Regions:
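Mid-to-C-terminal polyanion-binding domains and interfaces
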Residues: 54-57, 294-334, 376, 383-540
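Hydrophobic helix-and-loop "lid/oligomerization" segment in the mid-to-C-terminal part
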Residues: 2-117, 138-139, 188-413, 480
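A residue-level signal for conserved active-site and pocket-lining positions in enzyme catalytic cores
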Residues: 12, 120, 272, 452, ...
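Structured core elements
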Residues: 60-61, 121, 131, 143-144, ...
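Histidine-centered active-site/metal-ligand motif
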Residues: 147-148, 162, 339, 395, ...
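A short acidic, amphipathic alpha-helical/loop segment
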Residues: 130-135, 331, 346-349, 447, ...
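Internal, well-ordered alpha-helical segments in soluble enzyme and binding-protein domains
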Residues: 128-131, 156, 174-178, 182, ...
Length: 540
């Protein structure tokens, strides 16, 4: 390995990577992935599933309509299908049935799968105590696999969930990550029992787990870093044909190598769009496609749903921005004519525009999605506002909830009060200036870009390095993309793009000074020639 540049050494140090850990961090390998048996109850879950295979009982994988749920469902369906099992997939409908094992979704699952003997949940089920009991009363066995926080009572069945058993090494797995470990345990046991003698299934399943890990915004450290890095390395050779077809429709020109952005910004949002706008079943057909024709048709549909999602999102964002309350400690924006499936994205987009960033809730028809900046736990804020809510759930940075009838205004007031107290706990020193290093144009070389790539995969827990350049010269400012949603320009002569900020083109053109401080990330590009491009984060 060539000598690490001083700037890269500083980046590694800022991420807490010691000298002894640099090689492992820069070269994540499946050899360092912990064995599935270290995840409590994975053995019991695999035995229950193989018992159903041997008895030729019908198995239903009960998933979710988002990317994590779709990928987790596909992982277990692909695995069990390879064994010749009688297996079907079931995904609830977001708008009519809601998340997880609701009464309506369980009823439809039973109607569509008469004679089902075993239900295996993925990415849901940990809080479905009553519906698990209902299924058992009907003579249906249940295995719950999930990664969400449990309530006070666990379902009365085999449960595989790192949030329950607390194995530190697996604590940040997503639903598909849990399913991937279970699938590996299934294959090992099936081979030992003579139920499977075919080729390795690891490649396609790994790609699905890596995609879900990035899209579900899991920390990309430890086991997750290995999963995602190896999934990206194997994408071209092992990705399911549907994902490769979708990537060909979504990818930009000049891509040098696969990065976490391919998962987080190209594939993941498109798969999520199907569940948001129409049905997660459309995305599931994509990732389970076996032929090129089937894959291409499914990719066309999913890509079209993403276009629909963008149009709906843009209209909702414009309406939401018009309802912002200046200086409020939190924003609760009621959009009665919006689309519930896009509320979370719009909340995130609004939060990105806030300075300083504050928690944002977008409510559509009484159902809301919340997003919060670092340092504020939005789930805790919702809990403290619970008297105005029917239910809520989620994570520190993102959550969902339902508001009691006629209580949006009261909830807005209480939520803002709670967040004002939480915001005060985030001190200015913790926020910093958002820059990893201030650089000059001479620092921005291909060599630096190549070294930055070695820090991939970027995401939660391992953010992409943000550089700053003072007194940069801005030229050739112009809109980019469909309807001018993005902004293209040169910064000191270097090609640059500011995604999603086509709205400031005219403002920058009218600016009395074309010399500004610019924050950005760096990328390699082979479009036209091998060169460095900048991705703008902020112009000050």
């Amino acid at each position: 390995m060539s000598e690490i540049p001083q700037l890269v050494e500083r980046l590694l140090e800022s991420r807490g990577i010691s000298a002894d850990g640099i090689d492992e961090f820069l070269s994540p390998s499946l050899r360092d992935l912990a064995p599935p048996c270290e995840l409590p109850n994975v053995d019991a879950a695999a035995e229950a599933m193989l018992a159903a295979v041997r008895a030729r009982r019908k198995i239903v994988i009960f998933g979710d309509y988002d990317c994590d749920g779709v990928c987790a469902t596909a992982i277990l369906v692909r695995t069990l299908s390879a064994f010749g099992a009688d297996v079907s997939a079931f995904l609830p409908e977001r708008l009519s049935e809601g998340y997880g094992m609701s009464e309506a979704s369980v009823a439809r699952m039973l109607k569509e799968n008469p004679g089902v003997g075993l239900v295996v949940t993925v990415d849901n089920g940990i809080n479905s105590v009553e519906n698990v009991a209902f299924l058992k009363e009907k003579g249906v066995d249940v295995v719950v696999t999930d990664h969400h926080l449990p309530g006070d009572t666990l379902p009365d069945c085999v449960v595989v969930n790192p949030k329950v058993s607390h194995p530190e090494i697996f604590e940040n797995l997503c639903g598909a990550g849990v399913a991937f470990l279970l699938a590996n345990e299934l294959v090992t046991k099936a081979r030992g029992a003579g139920l499977y003698s075919g080729p390795s299934l690891a490649g396609p399943l790994l790609v699905l787990a890596g995609l879900a890990t990035v899209t579900d915004v899991m920390p990309l450290l430890g086991q997750n870093r290995i999963l995602v890095a190896e999934a990206l390395n194997r994408f071209d050779s092992f990705a399911p044909v549907g994902l490769r077809s979708l990537f060909s429709k979504a990818a930009r020109r000049g891509v040098v190598r696969h990065t976490s952005k391919d998962f987080g910004f190209l594939l993941g949002p498109r798969i999520n769009a199907a569940g948001r706008i129409a049905s997660g079943a459309e995305a599931l057909r994509l990732v389970l496609a076996n032929s090129q024709d089937e894959a291409d048709e499914a990719a066309r549909i999913v890509n079209g749903r993403n276009d629909e999602r963008k149009n709906v999102e843009q209209k909702m964002l414009e309406n939401a921005l018009a309802k912002i309350v200046p200086s409020a400690a939190a924003q609760v924006i009621d959009l009665p004519d919006g689309h519930q499936g896009v509320a979370g994205i719009v909340a995130a987009r609004v939060m990105e525009r806030m300075d300083p960033k504050v928690p944002v809730c977008v409510v559509v028809g009484g159902h809301g999605s919340a997003r919060a900046p670092d340092g504020i736990n939005v789930r805790d804020a919702l809990a403290a506002s619970g008297e105005f809510l029917n239910r809520f759930g989620g994570h520190a940075a993102a959550a969902g909830f339902s508001v009691k009838d006629g209580m949006v205004d009261a909830f807005r007031e209480r939520f803002a009060e709670v967040c004002a107290g939480l915001s005060a706990e985030v001190c200015d020193e913790e926020r910093g200036d958002g820059v990893d290093a201030w650089v000059s144009p001479d620092d921005l070389t291909i060599e630096l870009a190549e070294w930055i790539t070695r820090l991939e995969p970027f995401g939660e827990g391992n953010p992409e390095p943000v550089f700053g350049m003072k007194n940069a010269v801005l030229r050739d400012i112009r809109p980019l993309g469909a309807e001018g949603r993005h902004l293209a320009l040169t910064v000191n002569g270097m090609r640059s793009v500011w995604w999603g900020r086509g709205d400031v083109v005219e403002e920058l053109r009218r600016s009395s000074s074309a010399v500004r401080d610019v924050l950005f990330t760096v990328e390699e590009s082979d479009y036209g020639s091998h060169h460095v491009e900048l991705r703008i984060v902020e112009i000050r």
